[in-house]
Each structure stands twice: as structure tokens, then as C-alpha cells.
Amino acid sequence: STNTNDYRNTLDSLYNVYGKEPFAAEIRIAEMNLLQRERYQGNKAHQDSVQALIYSLCKESIAQYPKYDRINVFKNQLNEMEMPVLNIQSDNNVYPGKDLTLQIKYVNTPRLVVRIYKSLRQPEDAWRNYGKNSKSMRGELVKEVTFKMNLANSYTEADSTLAIPMDRLGLYEYVITVPGKQLTVSNRFSVSRLAALTRSQTNNPEVLVTDLESGKPIEGATVIYYKTNMMNGTIQRQGEVKTDQLGIAILPAKKKIEHIRPVLREDSSSIITNIYPYGT
């Protein structure tokens, strides 16, 4: 806006006159606050350019006014900008022989170490919060891969996709760490050929079990159904039904069913799917 530009011009004029004085750090702080308002506006390119301005303003001010009593304003801002960040999206289920795909948004994580463990959890407890005991639910380490990440600098968010091939059926947990930094992200996933979809158009909810890759219906699969125990939050097995030649299993109408998961012989680790009143 015009007001913002006028204010910025005034700050620039003041800085040109008083820049050598220690109190000119206050002018720089005001400039930084002005830039902060723009930091999340506009497109990514604009945001990145504003970030770069804030970063260089902080660096220059720390060098120029090292003894100024509010210099920590700039140091704290740099620390916040350079804080490592890791946001990860991944599939709950991976087809055997395909990749576990991790979609990552990251800031200041030069290297990532991805470790994949067999999980000692029951598949229905994949999402359960075990708190401090979570680590004890990790079994054998099956893979460890280090990825070097592209970083334009130490403060801009970037994104990337990491792929790790998975072959054997089972329930797993990935744990991602950043060497030298206190940051860990973990999640569970299953390696299974089975996919389950529910629909509740009729009185009896139906489950269709298919091959995750081809979409072909699977006959003779077992669909285990569960409900949540409201007292302690655990998921309790209620019973099971089998799929017919069309890959369809009919769930009992009268039971309170909240989760299902398909199993077929050794393919027994698929993660639960929640059932909503109108299907998954």
C-alpha cells in the first residue's frame, strides 16, 4: 500500500542519515517488522525474496551493531528462520516390489537418514500412541538410507520426493532423523497387496477387497472388523467375514463397526481402514 511504501521510504531516509549511530539498529528493527508482515503474502517466489531480505538485514545488523542492547532481536529471528523443519506425507500401504514414497517439505536439513524397522505392533494398533514406549515397538532394522538434500540456503522451504523400494509383506515403521539436529519424524506403513473399500448404501455395509495394483477383486479374503473401546481407546476385534467371487464381503448390520482390515494367507499386515456412516 501507499502508506507502507511511505513508511519504508521514511525508514530508508532515517537510516541514510543515522546509519552510523548505534541507535540506528532500531530503524533496522522497524524495517524487519515491516518485512515480517510481507513474509507470508504473495506467491512462493515473493515469499522467498522477502525471506532473503530479512535474512541479510539480520546478518548485516548483527555485524554492524554487535554491542547494541537489543541485538538479540536479530539473533532470535535468524534462529527461528534456520530452525530445521520436516513435514512428511506417505502412503499407509505399499505394494510389494514398489516404493515407499515420502513426499517431504523441509528447511535446513542438509542430510536425512531414513531407517525402516519391522514393527512389533499389531496392525490394528498401527496408529496407537504408545508415548515413551513407541521405540520398544520397533523390531529389526531392515533398511537404512542416507539422502543428501538440495538446500539453496539455510532458511527457505524446499520439497522433494524420496523413494525406498519395499519387497516383503509386513508392518513397518520408518524413522527419519537429521544428523546433528534434534529432529525425528516417524510413521507406520504396511506392505500388502490388499485394498479394501466400504460402502453403506444398503442396511448391511459391504466391503470390496481388491488387488491394490490391478484393482482385480479378490475372492476368499478375510475382512476383520473392529470397534474402539471408549474406556481406554484400544481397538477391539469383533469378528470376521469372507469375500465372495466378486471380492465382496457383507458386514453384519447390527454391530457397531468402526474399522476393518483385509487379510489373505501370509498377507496379514494391512493397516486398518476407518468406516464412516457413508463408506470410506
Question: Where are the language model's segments positioned?
Answer:
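N-terminal, cleavable Sec-dependent signal peptides of secreted/periplasmic/extracellular proteins
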Residues: S1-T280
